[in-house]
């Protein structure tokens, strides 16, 4: 196994362990033992736990970003794409809730460095979709795309993930809130168009749900 393969195996194992037991509850020694690897080998690849956590967050974000861009190629209706991205974010946040929340609590610099960038990228993607929908005449007059995204994030902040939350229940709550919010931005004609496409792309929502459950 070469260094890159070893690195990937370490990251995948660490994500599972951090998410199951928490970042504070897992030591570098624990990870080395789980992989039947010497501590020296582990520290040659990752100098400390912070570096390993960064790699874990990078992988989680890269997977989510790849899903967003792949979906953007397949979904033509901009407001449906915005809903899909919002729901997939919720599912990913639920799946990796403990990893993300404990990184934020115990390693705030690591969390802010990576999640600030990721959040900004998602905001820009949502904003571009809303701007495109506005240009096409799908939205009511006077809708500001940047403000709409900010209000959406404020709305979703009210849905805090609890440790015993069911993934599907949480994602449904987020999806329903986002759905109601997006409908409020649209004209009557665009709502009809939105609903006509909803069933057409329903399998995409089911696909992301299955992948992130």
Region spans (language model):
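Short, charged helix-capping/linker segments at alpha-helix termini
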Residues: 24-25, 139-143
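C-terminal peripheral helix-coil segments that are non-catalytic and often amphipathic
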Residues: 131, 168-213
């Amino acid at each position: 196994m070469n260094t890159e393969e070893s690195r990937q195996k370490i990251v995948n194992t660490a994500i599972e362990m951090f998410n199951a037991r928490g970042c504070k509850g897992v030591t570098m020694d624990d990870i080395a033992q789980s992989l039947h690897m010497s501590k020296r080998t582990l520290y040659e690849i990752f100098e400390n736990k912070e570096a390993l956590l960064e790699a874990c967050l990078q992988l989680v974000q890269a997977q989510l970003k790849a899903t967003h861009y792949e979906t953007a190629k397949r979904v033509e209706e901009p407001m449906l794409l915005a809903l899909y991205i919002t729901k997939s974010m919720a599912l990913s946040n639920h799946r990796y809730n403990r990893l993300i929340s404990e990184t934020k609590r115990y390693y705030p610099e690591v969390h802010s460095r990576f999640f600030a960038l990721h959040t900004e990228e998602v905001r820009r993607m949502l904003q571009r979709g809303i701007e495109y929908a506005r240009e096409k005449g799908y939205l009511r007059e006077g809708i500001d795309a940047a403000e709409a995204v900010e209000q959406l994030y404020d709305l979703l902040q009210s849905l805090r993930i609890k440790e015993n939350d069911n993934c599907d229940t949480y994602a449904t709550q987020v999806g329903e809130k986002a759905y109601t919010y997006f409908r409020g931005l649209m004209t009557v004609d665009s709502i009809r168009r939105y609903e006509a496409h909803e069933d057409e792309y329903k399998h995409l929502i089911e696909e992301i749900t299955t992948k992130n459950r």
